[in-house]
Design a protein with these regions (language model features):
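Short gly/ser/thr-rich secondary-structure transition/capping motifs
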Residues: 15-21, 54-55
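Short beta-strand or tight-loop elements
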Residues: 3, 20-22, 69
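NAD(P)H dinucleotide-binding glycine-rich loop of Rossmann-like/cofactor-binding domains
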Residues: 90-138
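Glycine-rich beta-strand-centered segment in the early N-terminal region that forms part
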Residues: 25-43, 54-94, 100, 112, ...
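Terminal peptide-recognition signature
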Residues: 7, 38, 135
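Short structural boundary motif marking the start of a folded domain
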Residues: 2-8, 34
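Cytochrome P450 core scaffold surrounding the K-helix E-X-X-R motif
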Residues: 46-51
């Protein structure tokens, strides 16, 4: 992993809201015990609201949206995940309360992840996302 990578960062200072792709480093990622190289991230309705104006969904700025993502574990301090594990992250208020998947790398709590089934590609795993999984339950 290189020291710097790109992330879509939203920020709000007073009444001024901004969004831009920025170069950040691993230390910018605040939460979690598993570092993931993000391969795909879906566009969720909440992501669209956050990208529009923060939509009062984000409590702390700057912030990286992206409620759903899939990728490969790069580093882990969680006993359930090791380097090379292919994962999916959806829900748990990732992208709202925690930095999300609109970044080349994401750092999240291991309990937010599931191992991706081998018969499902990273891209396929993002087709449904949180919204699709919610609809299935209705």
């Amino acid at each position: 992993m290189s020291d710097n990578f790109k992330a879509l960062v939203v920020n709000q200072e007073g009444d001024k809201f901004s969004r831009e792709v920025k170069s950040v480093n691993k230390e910018f990622l605040k939460h979690g015990d598993v570092l993931v190289k993000v391969e795909y991230s879906g566009l969720n309705y909440k992501d669209a609201l956050i990208l529009k104006n923060g939509a009062k969904l984000v409590k702390e700025f700057p912030h990286i949206p992206g409620i759903d993502f899939s990728g490969t574990v790069v580093e882990s301090k969680n006993e359930n995940y090791k380097q090379g594990d292919e994962i999916i992250c959806t829900g748990w208020r990732v992208g709202e309360l925690y930095y999300g998947g609109y970044s080349q790398y994401a750092k999240v709590k291991g309990e937010f992840l599931v191992k991706r089934p081998k018969n499902l590609s990273a891209k396929q795993s993002m087709i449904l996302g949180t919204a699709g999984l919610t609809a299935i339950q209705c």
